[in-house]
């Protein structure tokens, strides 16, 4: 209807000029006046996004808006994404325990959802944060990340991220040799396959670089300087993030 369109146009205008308070209020009002309209869940979702853009002090309010969407429109496709955003906001607020529950509910409630891997990886992030230096907790995270890499059709960028975090959990729990194996296999998966290396996005290249720099560090600590140098030179050759760090480390090894 014309009335509905007017709300959408008004909110878009406010958002365009950076008036996120008015944009949020307009979208919230649309959802309140037309709760049965198919656009109502989208309006709440966008209201929460505008709220988030207002700054960290408004994250709790954004969490409530995402929760309202999930509570009122449990069968809407946006339900899953609202819960993901809710979990992400809770993490940003350092409420890792609360965020973990949100992700676990998504994993258990929607085991075949196409975005399950995001919930899985996000849960692992929460568990890593909560584990601290607890070996049992870190071991649990390592198992979850290992299983995550077995999920079908896992995007390449997420493969690189999951592998790096798996190795990080192993290193923190003292399993250096296993971590070295994970890092080596991850590097080989991408560097050894030119097509995969090219297909990596910016995030994937970042996580691959972290893996390779970490692998180089382990080799250095084990006095295997030839392998460390080889890994660093691959970082340089593929122009990965942290290239300057790799150059510096190669220079130090050669001195």
What are the residue ranges of the model-derived segments?
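Acidic, polar-rich low-complexity tracts and alpha-helical solenoid repeat scaffolds
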Residues: 1-255
């Amino acid at each position: 209807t014309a009335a509905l369109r007017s709300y959408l146009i008004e909110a878009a205008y406010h958002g365009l000029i950076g008036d996120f308070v008015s944009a949020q209020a307009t979208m919230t009002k649309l959802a309140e006046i037309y709760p049965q309209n198919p656009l109502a869940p989208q309006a709440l979702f966008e209201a929460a996004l505008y709220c988030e853009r207002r700054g960290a002090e408004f994250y709790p309010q954004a969490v409530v808006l995402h929760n309202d969407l999930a509570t009122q429109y449990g069968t809407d496709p946006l339900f899953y994404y609202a819960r993901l955003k809710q979990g992400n906001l809770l993490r940003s607020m350092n409420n890792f325990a609360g965020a973990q529950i949100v992700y676990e509910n998504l994993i258990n409630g929607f085991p075949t959802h196409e975005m399950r891997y995001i919930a899985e990886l996000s849960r692992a992030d929460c568990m890593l944060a909560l584990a601290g230096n607890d070996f049992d907790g870190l071991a649990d995270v390592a198992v979850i990340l290992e299983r995550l890499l077995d999920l079908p059709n896992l995007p390449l960028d997420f493969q690189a991220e999951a592998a790096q975090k798996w190795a990080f959990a192993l290193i923190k729990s003292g399993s250096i040799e296993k971590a070295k194996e994970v890092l080596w296999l991850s590097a080989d998966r991408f560097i050894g396959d030119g097509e995969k290396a090219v297909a990596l996005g910016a995030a994937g290249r970042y996580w691959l670089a972290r893996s390779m720099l970490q692998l180089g560090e382990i080799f250095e600590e084990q006095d295997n300087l030839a392998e460390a140098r080889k890994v660093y030179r691959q970082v340089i050759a593929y122009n990965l993030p942290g290239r300057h760090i790799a150059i510096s480390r190669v220079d130090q090894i050669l001195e």
